[in-house]
Structure formats: C-alpha cells, structure tokens
Amino acid sequence: MFRMSRSVYVFGARCVILFALFPLLSWPAWGENRLLALQKDVPLHPAVTAFFSNDDEFISEVVIPSMERERKDEIHLKIVSSDGAPLQTCQVSAELQKLEFHFGHCNLATEKSSRNRHLLSSLFHFTCPENLTKWKNYAPDLGVYDFSKIDSMVDYCDANEINIEWHFLSGYHPEWFTSLQTDAEKAASQLANSRAVLNRYQDSVNFFQVFNEDWHTHIERAKVFCDQTELFKTLRKEFPKVELGVCDCWSFNKENRLPSVEEVMSRYPGINFVSMHAHKPRRLWASPKEMFDTFEQYKDSDIKIHVTEFGIIKGEIEGVYRTGDWDDATLAEYFVQVAATAFSHPSVRVLNLWANYDKFTGNRLFGEDGKPTELYEALNSLLNHKLTTHVTGETDENGACVFSGFHGRYKLKVKSSSGRLFTAQFDVGRKATHAKLVINEVEGTAHVTID
C-alpha cells in the first residue's frame, strides 16, 4: 500500500530496568520514591524469548519501544489516613491483575468444558462469540426472539468481568428472512432486529458490529438491504452512547488492508471501531511491519481497530517474512508476534482468537487429550509472565511512591505502621495514572480514588 521509513515509527525508547527480588525498601531515582519491579521466577516460553530478542530491527526499534510508550505509564501512588495525613514507611505491593487491552477468545463464554473454560479465562477477558449472537441463532420467526442463551452468556460475562463484542446486528439472515417478498421488507426487518438487540443489551454488551462481510467482501447471508449509511446514522442517533462498528474480512496483506479513515467516517458517521478478521490468506505469516502498516493510518483518529477473528490453517507458510510449514513451534512464534505487535500499536484495542476446534487448525489451544497445547503455553507465558507488572517497596515521608507499569487493573496491598494489612483494586489508563489510597485504621477500610 505504501512505504514508510523507519523514522516514522521510531521515538525515544523508554529504558526499562527489571530488578531482582530485594527486601522491601525504596529505590531513589529521578528524585522520586520508586518501587522495585519483581521478576517472576518462571522461564519464558522460547517463542516469547525469540520475539523479544529478535534480530528484526523493526521489532527492536519500533514495536517494543511503542509497547513501552503506549501501554505503560508512570503510576503515582499516595497513601493517606482518613484525615488526609500521609502514611510514611508503609509496605506497599502492587500487582497487575488484568491488562486494559482486550485479549479475547471466541469460545471464552461458550466453551462447554469447565476445565477448558477455566484455562481460557486465565488468558483472556474478552469475547467476540463465533455464532451465538448472529441473528439466525436467536430469531426463530419474524418478530420472535429467543435470547435465553445470550442472556446466560451475558450473565456469565458480567460475573467474570468479560467484555463482549456483538457479532453482528444485520445477519446472518434467519431462514425465514428469504420469505420476505421485497427489499424494503428485508430492510425494515434488519432495522427492527438492530433496535431489538440494542434496546435489550445496550447496557450489558460493550461493542456492537452493525454490519459484517458486506463491504470488502459480499456474503449473501450477510447482505444489507437498506442504505448502510442511513441505517448507521439512525442507530447512532437513537443509541448515542453505544459503541458501534463494522466488520469485514480485512487482513494484513495489501489486498485486504483496512479502508482509509476518511472512507470509514464518510460511510458510517459516528463510528467507534472497525473489526478486521485477519484470517486471510489462511496461512499468511505477516511481518510486524506489515501489521504496523495496516494499523498506522488509524493512529491519529478516534476509530479503534479490533482484530476479532484471527486464525491460521495449517499447511505451508504463505508470505515472504518466514518460510516452511506451520507446526507447533512456528504457530507459537507467530501468535506471540501477532499478540505482542497488536498490543504495541495505540490504534488497536482488541485481539480475539477464532474457531478453536474446527476450520482453523492452527488455533487449537487444547490437544486431543485435553491438555494445553504449545500455543496455549506460549500465550500464557506472554500474557501472564511477560506483559505483567509486580512491584514492591515503601512509602516515603509524603506517603508517596511511583512505579512504571502496564495499563490495567491492579491489586494493591499496603501494610501500615500498625502492622495491619489493607487491600484494594484500582484501574490505570492513559488519563488515569495518579491513585490515592485512603486508609481508615479504626474501621479497617481502604478505598482508592483516581486523579
């Protein structure tokens, strides 16, 4: 599509220092009381080590610095008493519980095996279901809905803090849809279904794909029978607070690149996100630069990119970046690369894996014996051992401390000078990096406020 010099991407890389495990004490740096970073005593998977020590300069000079710059911040903590007095020399520990970035799986909330669902939930906290929210699966007749299975999924996701993307409002068409005589009737039915779903789930589902596979690709069962721009404008006006997007079979190769920001905004006024399948060509090993080139045009826009159907079919590797065959080792390497590279780009908000068992033979996270595959172990190493933050130390004379950490939800443990242990959770993001923990020793309570 276009070529960019490396200078477009390269900015000053943040120096990240990982300390070994020390006793609880403060570390003086830059005039601030810095907490010490703790390393997990677990060796990284070879695929993770291979990516972060790769001799591809684009990874070392662009991807990794972008990850440090875009997904981390200096997080400032202050510990005070209920009357506002700073609490000095409190022992402090903060550990990342969940990344702000949405790593997901299509079967996270629908997996039938309780064991496998537990294993999935230790990696992911987002789902774009493969089939459950398609129109044909909850509308047995015109104007008749059976949302019982979706309600159960939504309840499960709410209880387990799993975010949901609806796939998708305008299709696939139910069987009875073909009996409608005119395009006008079909258009009215698609609008009515969109309204029914949004009215029911606008407060419990995070993202809604309005259309899928009827722009870049044209699938008959996904065909939209009304003016797409007008339908989108109608839903945007009626549901102003809902996150609306579109989905299609866009990918990382030049033939399937995302449309321009200008095209998307003109076609879908008020759009919040675009969801790309990223599974064609079926055996493509895209380079990190090809991935960045796909994402980069959205960098300065408010439209986020969701990679919602990522998958590989085994066979001979396609593309020029790597050659050979897809096997356990190469799949582990590529999925780590895709996850880390998507995570590093500020335009991307979601990476959702597709089709665990069927067509996408390269996506299997569990073997025939039910045990986690090499791919699962590699993703577990990346998400739970590499992209994590765990720090410890003490507050200074101002009750303050600071650390560098990934954006997400943290569990904070504070032991006051009285020896009492207090725990709390708080969320850190780009615009929320200052947290104050207020401790009430008398009542034994603690709560966090974010500035």
Please describe what each predicted stretch is.
Residues 43-45, 97-151, 156, 162-163, ...:
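N-terminal substrate-binding region of glycoside hydrolase catalytic domains
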Residues 45-48, 200, 209, 214-220, ...:
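Aromatic-rich peripheral "rim/lid" segments of glycoside hydrolase catalytic domains that contact
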Residues 124-132, 205-212, 246-248, 257-288, ...:
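Aromatic- and acid-rich polysaccharide-binding/catalytic face
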Residues 139-149, 176-262, 282-293, 321-334, ...:
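Active-site cleft segment of glycoside hydrolase catalytic domains centered on the general acid/base Glu
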Residues 115-124, 151-161, 197-202, 237, ...:
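Acidic (Asp/Glu)-rich catalytic clusters
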